[in-house]
UniProtKB/Swiss-Prot annotation:
Biased composition (Pro residues): 248-257, 275-284, 407-419, 482-504
Protein encoded by which gene: Uncx
Pfam families xref list: Homeodomain
Biased amino acid composition, Basic and acidic residues: 195-205
DNA-binding region: 109-168
Organism: Mus musculus (Mouse)
GO cellular component, one term: nucleus
Compartments in which it is found: Nucleus
Compositionally biased region (Basic residues): 206-224
Protein name from the UniProt record: Homeobox protein unc-4 homolog
Length: 530
């Protein structure tokens, strides 16, 4: 280890000893001594002291040439002449006491940083305030008075002038400090605390004003945006949601007089209708405000084409009469958007019946027209095949159970005998099963096939021929062209029917459950003749 440290420093003061250890083939001259640096000389002296004598703090910390010469076992005569050590000067002080280049040209070393004391800096600042460019005589006087070297004083003045120029060139406006400004003066003295407090106060006030302005702007934007959104979205919500279908507020029940007011109301013609099973969704023809966007509470009652005027005034939805006078809340307002309840799309049949105050589910539709072919977009998916969207004819009055077209002549009443109805309802088709085109009135009669009764059938068909309209025209319905029955008598089934009024769309049931066409949804409600 020690030999390795000795090999790292093959310097001149160890010429004799290193020559014996390493065996250099040439002697070391004086020019090798001039290449030494100060820190290398210190480390070499410490290594030599550690190799010759036991470790000691003095041997490790001594940095002078005299200590190195005393610790070397075989000193060479080159050492005192090389470093020029007379014992009175020590060139390795932290604060420069002289210029080593002038006093000892043989010992070239790296100059350490000069540490100025506080009173030295004060004297230098006073001299700088008097003159930025002192002459050589003034610098010499400062160096003698401050125990410094004239070259250090000259370098300090150069740095001080550069700092002063930089500060002068980078001055900004009155409110913005320079990028290199600190709360100290150029001489390192602390700034006036009042000045620092004033600058900090200005900075805080400026930041506070900026924050208040930003907060006020955000509040004004927040106040303006919901109002404008609700104003602009009110008509669009009317057109998009039929009768407030998107609003989370539950619909209010209609007044009790609305149920029995008009011919198209719920309670007028429901007595003979069969209730819809609770498991099936309601047909689009029922009184659901979602399927009829043209009947809106906000737009008023708009008369429809091809319908009597009295049908348009009838409230269709449960909350139509209640919401007609009240301003509808926008579905995009802050209250409706933040409410936890989901938007009510469509009421279930049980809920609709309970809301309307009915003891059973309404089966007859209130508005028979559907959205197909009217140019509207379907807001909700169709839950039934298109073949079973069967609108029913609304009853004209609640007094008479029988439906008669307005333009047809009065027909003689049908015989009320149950055998005649049974034989008419069970007239066999071509395959021997019950004919769906002539299925009538009550399901128990249809379900029990019996032998045909030609006499009663002839009476009924003769009465229908006299009236000039088919049997289906008596009840206000149009049956599809069915297969001709066995040749008993010419029936007006395949022939042209008397058209129903436009206000009463016709319907006829599909195949019966017992027929060969397979299972199908329940057919449209029929009105009993009795």
């Amino acid at each position: 280890m020690m030999d390795g440290r000795l090999l790292e420093h093959p310097h001149a003061q160890f010429g004799g000893s290193l020559g014996g250890v390493v065996g250099f083939p040439y002697p070391l001259g004086h020019h090798h001594v001039y290449e030494l640096a100060g820190h290398q000389l210190q480390s070499a002296a410490a290594a030599a002291a550690a190799a010759s004598v036991p470790f000691s703090i003095d041997g490790l910390l001594s940095g002078s040439c005299a200590a190195a010469a005393a610790s070397v076992v075989n000193p060479t005569p080159l050492l005192p002449a090389a470093c020029g050590v007379a014992g009175e000067s020590q060139p390795f002080k932290l604060a420069d006491s002289g210029d080593p280049d002038k006093e000892s040209p043989g010992c070239k070393r790296r100059r350490t940083r000069t540490n100025f004391t506080g009173w030295q800096l004060e004297e230098l600042e006073k001299a700088f305030n008097e003159s930025h460019y002192p002459d050589v005589f003034m610098r010499e006087a400062l160096a003698l008075r401050l125990d410094l070297v004239e070259s250090r004083v000259q370098v300090w003045f150069q740095n001080r002038r550069a700092k002063w120029r930089k500060k002068e060139n980078t001055k900004k406006g009155p409110g913005r400090p320079a990028h290199n400004s600190h709360p100290t003066t150029c001489s390192g003295e602390p700034m006036d605390p009042e000045e620092i407090a004033r600058k900090e106060l200005e900075k805080m006030e400026k930041k506070k004003r900026k924050h208040e302005k930003k907060l006020l702007k955000s509040q004004s934007r927040h106040l303006h945006s919901p109002g404008g959104l609700s104003l602009h979205s009110a008509p669009s919500s009317d057109s998009d949601s039929g009768g407030g279908g998107l609003s989370p507020e539950p619909p209010e029940p209609p007044p009790p007089t609305a149920a029995a007011k008009g011919p198209g109301a719920h309670g007028s013609g429901i007595a003979g209708s069969a209730p819809v099973p609770p498991g099936e969704p309601p047909a689009p023809g029922t009184c659901d405000p979602a399927f009829y966007p043209s009947q809106r509470s906000g737009a008023g009652s708009q008369p429809r084409l091809g319908r009597p005027a009295d049908k348009d005034t009838v409230p269709c939805g449960p909350g139509a009469a209640a919401t007609a006078g009240l301003p509808k809340a926008s579905p995009f307002s802050v209250e409706s958007l933040l409410s936890d309840s989901p938007p009510r799309r469509k009421a279930t049949p049980a809920n609709a019946a309970a809301t309307a105050g009915l003891d059973f589910t309404p089966g007859l539709p209130c508005a028979p027209r559907t959205l197909i072919g009217k140019g509207h977009f379907l807001l909700y998916p169709i839950t039934q095949p298109l073949g079973f969207l069967v609108p029913q004819a609304a009853l004209k009055g609640g007094a008479g159970p029988e439906l008669v077209p307005k333009d047809a002549p009065p027909a003689p009443p049908a015989p009320p005998a149950p055998p005649a109805q049974a034989s008419f309802g069970t007239f066999p088709g071509p395959g021997g099963a019950a004919d769906p085109a002539f299925a009538r009135r009550s399901p128990e009669v249809v379900a029990s096939p019996g032998p045909p009764a030609p006499a009663s059938f002839r009476d009924l068909t003769a009465a229908a021929a006299e009236s000039g309209a088919g049997d289906c025209a008596d009840v206000g319905t149009v049956c599809p062209a069915a297969s001709p029955p066995p040749p008993l008598e010419t029936s007006p089934g395949p022939g042209p029917r008397a058209p129903s009024p436009p206000g009463e769309p016709a319907t006829c049931g599909a195949a019966e459950p017992g027929a060969a066409t397979g299972p199908s949804p329940p057919e449209g409600e029929e009105v009993d003749m009795d």
